[in-house]
Swiss-Prot record:
PFTB repeats lie at residues 148-190, 586-626, 635-676. Residues 1-47 are annotated as: Disordered. It catalyses: (S)-2,3-epoxysqualene = lanosterol. This is Lanosterol synthase ERG7. GO terms for molecular function: lanosterol synthase activity. GO terms for cellular component: endoplasmic reticulum membrane; lipid droplet. It comes from Gibberella zeae (strain ATCC MYA-4620 / CBS 123657 / FGSC 9075 / NRRL 31084 / PH-1) (Wheat head blight fungus).
Length: 766
């Protein structure tokens, strides 16, 4: 494929436009009835799915027309996402770790998308797809048969093999949240109640107490859908947004993901807006409860919650506040003028979020709620509603199992930056073969830098973002400390070390540094989206129940390390720019990382699983302040912790349970290549002196590599809010290539080969 300077696929643009137009569903029309439920097919032809990469805006299209399918051939990337054969020849059997890294890059390079980045599913949470389906339903948005079938296939494939329910995420045990939401989603896309998948799931839901034991977010969605009465939903008072900013629990102090959800949720709660009753909704009222719907006393079930769902029980403070709002404030004291003022302010905040992201929104959780709010407020003909429906498509992803919803609109900038760094660690940037790939990546990151602050930044409580990079793309528009750092490192390496043209001038790197310096908290640690604004006691107001550490920004060893390493690299080439501030941040941030180390030598990770992930980053930070295994106690204890977890086969294995329990837990499936790579990278960053443990880990990575250069998917890699896991499938390339390259650079005399390449006393080339 040929990409032009904008990142759009020029060679296929015409045929893609025609194909996309022929497949897309009609937009909403004023006063239209509920669309007919789509016809669920038995199977879809995976060779007809196409991913449109509009400079990292991803949309999937199912091509019914044979000519359209021929005009828009399926790429290697699309085939890989769908688990189709790429028909690639086996590569020469690697005779060294560097050769294995080269083979891995040879495969991964073929997955680069036309605009220069790498895409992938970012799935895992099992409540996101149902939220989109409910949003489509209540806004009367037609669902094509191909979408409905793909959704049915995915949800069915992810049902628990024993009880048929669904959990909070794909590896979790069945919960009321997951089971109720996915049950409802299947019914809304046209699956009949007597379908075997739903019969089994309904039995599990009833055994857990039925829908009344769903957590807060599920009850909210059931209120929107009209399956439950709003009296069952614990309060989401929009009036809290009218509090003065100095109030210690004012919502501008909350973590961005919770306050962006609270805004549309509060508006809809205050309006008590529900979808018009339909036959499906009436049927659901009979199916998801074990009680007679007409006899349910909704207010008495506000606090009912399933055992599995109740990860973060409501505090006495929150329960007291909820009781006062429900029993005193709402019925007796709440003046209508204040209610309307709070709704108007929440509505304005939602509009600012939509404007600052061109309706892409922070993530699908608030995107779906914003869509419903705008529909309820403005009606279907409103431009904002139409644009919301259009942009929801960018959260959808198709894989071999079917259609899911990603946790954001992608991981484009994040994964691209890591791949670039891996190439440099392996020294592969010196090979002319990879220059076109690297140049496309550089141009992509250049285009995705955020060039301006938000409109009315102070009014909508947004952190300055000019010069930053997002997790996904600039449309989403949220700078994140580690995303800024990793992208900045990648660009400096490409332009200063790799000798590529300077497509991003130094003034724009200075903008990135200016923004990055704003993320440090008073204790030296670095947050994710914003500098911390409130105290940890605000977790007493955590109403989500299924998540932990959700109310405020925290300090993260991963984010802190990214900032330390990026600013260290920046200072090497621009030693005179804000020298004092840069060096002070590096020093104080590294001191925080030291203080965050646990007595056993590990660091707790908040964005990857878990101690292995954080340990890799923390040990890299220590290296940048001159501390290694030989020279520093923190590095030595960190290495000893990782070595103590190495398995007999040379690998590392950590379960998502470690994130929940905050204690190291091995994954039942055994060693995992991604966590093995993380551990090895951390050990090598710390100059761990004993080569044998490193060799054993490298051997496992080489043994798991396939003859065509790829690694196969294993356990889930990422996490957020302690309890919800999320997939990073590209990690099995970026970090394995990096680990292999680092080992080859440090130990060039070690000529390891994969076990599968050995025959007798020699090595057989495939």
């Amino acid at each position: 494929m040929v990409a032009n300077s904008t990142g759009r696929d020029a060679s296929a643009l015409k045929s893609r436009k025609r194909a996309a137009d022929s497949e897309s569903e009609p937009l909403l029309k004023q006063g239209q009835p509920f669309p007919k439920q789509p016809r669920i097919g038995s199977e879809l032809d995976k060779t007809r799915w196409r991913l449109k990469d509009d400079d990292s805006r991803h949309t999937w299209h199912y091509l019914e027309d044979d000519d359209a399918a021929k005009e828009w051939p399926q790429s290697y990337a699309e085939k890989w996402y769908l688990n189709q054969s790429l028909d690639l020849p086996d590569l020469p059997s690697p005779d060294s770790p560097l050769a294995a890294a080269t083979n891995g890059l040879d495969f991964f390079e073929k997955l680069q998308l036309p605009s220069g980045h790498w895409g992938c599913e970012y799935g895992g949470p099992m409540f996101l797809l149902p939220s989109v389906v409910i949003t489509w339903y209540v806004t009367r948005t037609p669902i094509s048969p191909s979408k409905a079938t793909a959704i049915y296939n995915y949800i069915s494939a992810r049902a628990h093999p024993e009880d048929g329910g669904w959990g909070l995420h794909i590896e979790g045990e069945s919960s009321v949240f997951g089971t109720l939401m996915n049950y409802v989603a299947l019914r809304l896309v046209g699956v009949e109640a007597d379908d075997p998948v739903l019969v089994k799931a309904r039995g599990t839901l009833h055994k857990m107490g039925g829908a009344l034991y769903a957590p807060h977010w599920a009850k909210f969605w059931m209120g929107v859908l009209g399956v439950m009465d709003w009296d069952v939903v614990n309060p989401v008072p929009p009036e809290i947004w009218l509090l003065p900013d100095w109030v210690p629990f004012a919502p501008w102090r909350w973590w961005i993901h919770i306050r962006m959800v609270f805004l549309p949720m509060g508006w809809l709660y205050s309006k008590r807006w529900s979808c018009e009753e339909t036959d499906v909704i009436r049927s659901l009222r009979k199916e998801v409860f074990i009680e007679d719907y007409a006899k349910i006393k909704w207010t008495s079930h506000r606090n009912d919650i399933g055992v599995v769902d109740n990860y973060h029980p409501k505090s006495w403070l929150l329960n007291t506040a909820n009781w006062l709002i429900v029993n005193i404030w709402n019925p007796y004291l709440r003046p209508n003028v204040l209610k309307e003022k709070a709704e108007a302010w929440s509505s304005k905040q939602v509009d600012m979020e939509d404007a600052n992201t061109d309706y892409a929104c922070l993530a699908p959780v608030n995107a779906t709620m914003n869509t419903v709010m705008c529909y309820a407020r403005d009606g279907p003909d409103n431009y904002g509603v139409q644009r919301h429906i259009e942009r929801l498509e960018e959260f959808l992803w198709v894989k071999d199992e079917g259609m899911l919803v990603n946790g954001t609109n992608g991981v484009q900038c994040w994964d691209t930056a890591f791949l670039i760094q891996a190439v440099f660690e392996a020294g592969l940037h010196k090979d002319e073969k990879w220059k076109p790939m690297l140049m496309k990546s550089l141009q992509y990151l250049e285009r995705q830098q955020i060039r301006e602050d938000c409109v009315d930044q102070d009014v909508c409580y947004r952190q300055p973002r000019k010069g930053g990079w997002p997790f996904s793309n600039k449309d989403q528009g949220y700078g994140v400390s580690d995303c800024i750092s990793e992208a900045m490192k990648a660009i400096i390496l490409l332009q200063k070390v790799g000798g590529l043209p300077e497509v991003l001038e130094e003034r724009r790197l200075f903008d990135a540094v200016d923004t990055l310096l704003l993320y440090q908290n008073s204790n030296g640690g670095m947050s994710s989206y914003e500098k911390r604004r409130g105290g940890e006691w605000l977790e007493m107001l955590n109403a989500a129940e299924v998540f932990g550490r959700i109310m405020i920004e925290y300090d993260y060893p991963e984010c802190t390390t990214a900032c330390v390493t990026a600013l260290s690299l920046f200072n090497k080439y621009w030693p005179d720019y804000r020298t004092k501030e840069v060096k002070t941040l590096i020093r104080t941030a590294a001191e925080w990382i030291k203080s965050n180390q646990r007595p056993d030598g590990g660091w707790y990770g908040s964005w990857g699983i878990c101690f292995t992930y954080a340990g890799m980053f923390a040990l890299e930070s220590m290296k940048h302040i001159g501390q290694t295994y030989a020279t520093g106690e923190n590095s030595r204890r960190g290495c000893d912790f990782l070595i103590s977890k190495q398995r007999a086969d040379g690998g590392w294995s950590e379960s998502y349970k470690a994130c929940e329990t905050m204690e190291y837990v091995e994954h039942p499936s055994g060693s995992l290549v991604v966590q093995t790579a993380w551990a090895l990278i951390g050990l090598m960053e710390a100059d761990y002196p004993h080569v044998e443990p490193l060799k054993r880990g490298i051997q496992l990575i080489m043994d798991r590599q396939q003859p065509n250069g790829e690694w196969l998917q294993e356990a889930i890699e990422g996490v957020f809010n302690k309890s919800c896991m999320i997939s990073y499938p590209n990690y099995k390339f970026t970090f394995t290539i990096k680990a292999l390259g680092m080992f080859a650079k440090r130990f060039p005399e070690e000529k390891l080969v994969p076990s599968w390449a050995l025959q007798g006393n020699g090595i057989e080339k495939s």
